[in-house]
């Protein structure tokens, strides 16, 4: 089994209304709510199309639409894809996004990352069929992680923008505020601890990365399963020009996480630091938009 590549990513339209298209998810899922992919479309009648991927558990859908709406005003057909287990795709009895933080089981987490990536690939194919022309991708926070993976698996993404995101699950699991709930679970089930995780990432992860020569990641072959869905594992294969934004006071994505991801990307790239926290980075959305637009034109 190869991560994300064992699943079809041909789009099948289930419903269209107003500016929303609903696709069938090609990833098998136990929750019917996440078996459909809602996509908000903003048509600029352009030969350039950008897909925007939101972050984890975001509460307000309205402000997420600001980026695709703004790209549309600047000449890009744009789309906002709702991630699995979020908003209308949230299973009954759960909160938006919490299924990414509700378990320490690496195999379940891997499947949820994989589900997200397969849905992105399916959506990109839909946008390519509908609008033709060039494709671009932007991911915010968790959306940046799965956008990184998706970009490594395609050769037709012309530009990638990553905001307040990162890789290396040692930093994300043990140094991030948002994953505190996972650390509590680890303390209880003894599956992992900071010392054990650090040894894996210091000793075995570099060797694992060195031995990879393409982004076809075989499942159940890594020393630990989290290597198989870490954005860093895929980032070394990105050839797409990439712009990144790091929040200086980010307690969700540690600095080392962002820098590790940035440093391993082997393409034309730029990194900008913004004087905000993670959530407050939205206050500088116009700066992020302006820098991204300039970068994508180059």
Give residue spans per PLM region:
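Hydrolase active-site cap/lid region
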Residues: 149-215, 273
């Amino acid at each position: 089994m190869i991560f994300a590549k064992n699943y079809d990513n041909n789009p099948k339209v289930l419903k269209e209304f107003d500016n929303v298209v609903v696709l069938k998810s090609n990833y098998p899922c136990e929750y019917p709510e996440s078996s459909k992919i809602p996509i908000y479309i903003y048509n600029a009648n352009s030969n350039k199309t950008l897909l925007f991927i939101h972050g984890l558990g975001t509460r307000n859908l309205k402000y997420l639409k600001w980026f695709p709406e703004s790209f549309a005003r600047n000449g890009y057909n744009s789309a906002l894809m709702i991630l699995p287990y979020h908003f209308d795709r949230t299973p009954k009895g759960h909160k938006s996004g919490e299924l990414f933080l509700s378990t320490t089981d690496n195999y379940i987490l891997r499947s949820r990352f994989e589900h997200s990536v397969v849905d992105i690939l399916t959506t990109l194919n839909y946008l390519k069929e509908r609008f033709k022309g060039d494709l671009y991708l932007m991911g915010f926070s968790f959306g940046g992680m799965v956008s990184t993976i998706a970009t490594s698996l395609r050769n037709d993404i012309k530009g990638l923008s990553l905001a307040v995101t990162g890789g290396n699950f040692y930093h994300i699991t043990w140094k991030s505020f948002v994953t505190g709930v996972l650390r509590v679970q680890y303390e209880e089930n003894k599956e992992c601890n900071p010392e054990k995780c650090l040894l894996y990432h210091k000793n075995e992860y570099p060797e694992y990365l060195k031995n990879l020569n393409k982004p076809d990641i075989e499942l159940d072959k890594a020393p630990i399963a989290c290597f198989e869905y870490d954005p860093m594992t895929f980032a070394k294969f990105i050839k797409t020009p990439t712009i990144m934004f790091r929040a200086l006071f980010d307690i969700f994505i540690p600095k080392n996480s962002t820098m590790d991801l940035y440093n391993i990307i082997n393409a034309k790239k730029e990194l900008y630091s913004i004087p905000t926290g993670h959530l407050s980075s939205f206050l500088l959305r116009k700066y992020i938009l302006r820098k991204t637009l300039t970068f994508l034109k180059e």
